[in-house]
Each structure stands twice: as C-alpha cells, then as structure tokens.
Amino acid sequence: MYIVVVYDVGVERVNKVKKFLRMHLNWVQNSVFEGEVTLAEFERIKEGLKKIIDENSDSVIIYKLRSMPPRETLGIEKNPIEEII
C-alpha cells in the first residue's frame, strides 16, 4: 500500500515526528511524508506516531492508497521522489 502522512503537531514534537517518519517514509515537504509500506509497517508507523503525539492537541492524517498516484507539482519540488523500476 502507498501512504501519505501529513501532520500538524506541537513545536516540541515536530522533530521527533520528522525523525521517526524519516526512518519509514520519504520526506516530500514540510510536514508531509509518503511511501510504499507493508501492512505490518503501516501498523508500526501508526503505533509509533501514537507514542509521540499528543492526541488532544496534535493532528496526523494518513491517506492510504493502492499505489503511488500520479502527481502534479506547482512551484519547486523540495525533495523529488524517483520511481524505481
């Protein structure tokens, strides 16, 4: 499955969330990560994020897709993701 993770978390947790997600996904731009994961990896990511965030004040949205969708970028692409064939 392909996931896109977007988050809005307290300043004191931003670096922890970013560091955690970098271990599993590709950084796209500020507060956005994406990548191909297995179901087990997806569950580990969810559980890891739950341990870091404050569910009463932070927000994490995870979009689940079957595969990497076509993408159109307006402006500069901060971290281009190349498809590996």
From Swiss-Prot:
Q: Name one Pfam family in it.
A: CRISPR_Cas2
Record keywords: Hydrolase included? yes
What family name appears in the similarity comment?
Belongs to the CRISPR-associated endoribonuclease Cas2 protein family.
Q: What does this protein do?
A: CRISPR (clustered regularly interspaced short palindromic repeat), is an adaptive immune system that provides protection against mobile genetic elements (viruses, transposable elements and conjugative plasmids). CRISPR clusters contain sequences complementary to antecedent mobile elements and target invading nucleic acids. CRISPR clusters are transcribed and processed into CRISPR RNA (crRNA). Functions as a ssRNA-specific endoribonuclease. Involved in the integration of spacer DNA into the CRISPR cassette.
Q: Which InterPro entries match?
A: CRISPR_associated_Cas2, Virulence_VapD/CRISPR_Cas2
Q: Name one GO molecular function term.
A: metal ion binding
Its top-level enzyme class, in one word, is hydrolase
At which positions is Mg(2+) bound? D8
Organism source for this protein? Pyrococcus furiosus (strain ATCC 43587 / DSM 3638 / JCM 8422 / Vc1)
> Which cofactors are named for this entry?
Mg(2+)
Which terms are listed as keywords in the entry?
Antiviral defense, Endonuclease, Hydrolase, Magnesium, Metal-binding, Nuclease
> Its quaternary structure?
Homodimer, forms a heterotetramer with a Cas1 homodimer.
Q: What does the record give as EC number?
A: 3.1.-.-
Q: Which CDD domains match?
A: Cas2_I_II_III (cd09725)
Give the matching HAMAP family.
Answer: Cas2
Which example biological process does GO assign this protein? maintenance of CRISPR repeat elements
Provide the protein name.
Answer: CRISPR-associated endoribonuclease Cas2
Task: Give the source lineage, highest ranks first.
Answer: Archaea, Methanobacteriati, Methanobacteriota, Thermococci, Thermococcales
